[in-house]
Amino acid sequence: MVEKHLLEFLEKLQFLIAKNVKISHYGIENVKKICGVDIAYKGNLGFSVGVSMDINSGDYNYKSYVGEVNFPYIPGFLFMREAPLMIKAIEGLDCHLLLVDGHGIAHPRKSGIAAVIGVLLDFPTIGVAKSRLTGDLVNESEITYVYLNGEKVGVKFGRYFYSPGNKVDLQDCIELGKRGYPKVLKIADMLTKKIKKE
């Protein structure tokens, strides 16, 4: 059980993060090294893996970090459970763009975990999520957009949702989504499950 005053404090923090998100075109075609980060759980332990992959060769290396997670799962506050472990898992990895398993600005306070990590690290991030957290889906010119309060905050390709975290824009998300679910996140997901079993 999380006290109401703590959630209100965290909401204020999220609004501050959202104000510091930079939306600008990055250019997916310029990415040579891409990173992905994911997490799996066993009891109250979180197993986070960061993967750095060479776009051209497909070669990758990874780092893992295991830590205790005491904050409960509350929709909209995922960053409190996962961001600390994810940040530790990507420390020192070589990459130009970070893909985070979770939302960016397609979030009720425009401050999903990809936005939080992107702002804290001052780094280009895109959130790639398996379910919609907020907003309405609208089809335009063969692309499904996520609208929040009249603003486009994300796109849906297949069953996945892509939204800017920091230092990227919606066009970057579209270009990424058109390529299918990112291989670097598939690898990160596979490794978290493998490490969790060890």
Swiss-Prot record:
Cofactor(s) named in the record: Mg(2+)
InterPro entries: Endonuclease-V
Amino acids binding Mg(2+): 38, 101
Residues carrying the site annotation Interaction with target DNA: 73
Compartment list: Cytoplasm
MF annotations from Gene Ontology: deoxyribonuclease V activity; magnesium ion binding; RNA endonuclease activity, producing 5'-phosphomonoesters; single-stranded RNA binding
Pfam families according to UniProt: Endonuclease_5 (PF04493)
Catalytic activity reported: Endonucleolytic cleavage at apurinic or apyrimidinic sites to products with a 5'-phosphate
DNA repair recorded as keyword: yes
Primary location: cytoplasm
UniProt superkingdom: Archaea
EC assignment: 3.1.21.7
Listed PANTHER family: ENDONUCLEASE V (PTHR28511:SF1)
Protein name: Endonuclease V
Gene source species: Saccharolobus islandicus (strain M.14.25 / Kamchatka #1)
Taxonomic lineage from the root: Archaea, Thermoproteota, Thermoprotei, Sulfolobales, Sulfolobaceae
